[in-house]
């Protein structure tokens, strides 16, 4: 399974932080512009909370099937809300900006949101 540079950087950072995580990929028919499976990629436990981490693209027209992408994103958002699981969205982020401090701050922010 291919990973984007972004997800690879996040998993490397989680390893540095010694945070347990599992990489989960669903809906393999929906691919990113670079050909790796899209949708939520990362499930981790942060300070006692399960968090889903997902990357999204501003330009969904570059995806092979934009309608399918929108449909799947809606399913995923519903899942996160109905299961009360925080969803950390990372939009087209430059992976070089991701540091352990940046990631832990983002995770802290997402788990304090009111579900």
Positions of PLM-derived features:
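Nucleic-acid endo/exonuclease domains
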Residues: 1-115
